[in-house]
């Protein structure tokens, strides 16, 4: 391994964060700092798999991703392949809506030239929003000291965060780094690889009730 692992490609649904979005995130964060008590937001995730993975791997990776998001007060509720997640419903005043997304694990990447672990479609309105390429992920699971389910959980967390942020961007450090380093995988082993403050802002701002982000588009 060359010390860096590309998380996903750059060819699908790529947009930059405009000045208005950045200013809105700053404004929302300033408001949040005045109210340190954080609300919990719920996200329903329906995951289906076309691969035969080691026993317990997918279940334990879901748990790992759940723990990662719980640290930023986002609750992931996992649904099986045949379980339909509830539809998005508007919360009452001061309560967030429930957000749904779907993850599919497929045996192979669509092209030999595609070296990404997965792809996320943050701008899609419905359907499968995340596709994980198991032939790319499997060697990664066996190449580091971190437990396999933990690494898989971080892959899921990275892609879910893209969808929740609603933009195709990466951070210079942390979970949302475009290319994970050996140091990142060591941090995964101790569950110390985290989202950056900006990543948390973007995720929670989009999950917050609309009245909490009035004026942001």
Predicted feature residues:
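N-terminal secretory signal peptides that target proteins for export/translocation
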Residues: 1-12
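Bacterial N-terminal signal peptides
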Residues: 14-27
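Sec/Tat signal peptide C-region and signal peptidase I cleavage site
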Residues: 28-32
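Metalloprotease/metallohydrolase-associated module, dominated by Zn2+-dependent proteases
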Residues: 33-37, 46-47, 51-63, 120-146, ...
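Solvent-exposed loop and beta-edge segments used for protein-protein assembly and interaction
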Residues: 37-39, 97
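Short structural boundary motif marking the start of a folded domain
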Residues: 41-43
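Metzincin-family zinc-dependent endopeptidase catalytic domain
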Residues: 55-163
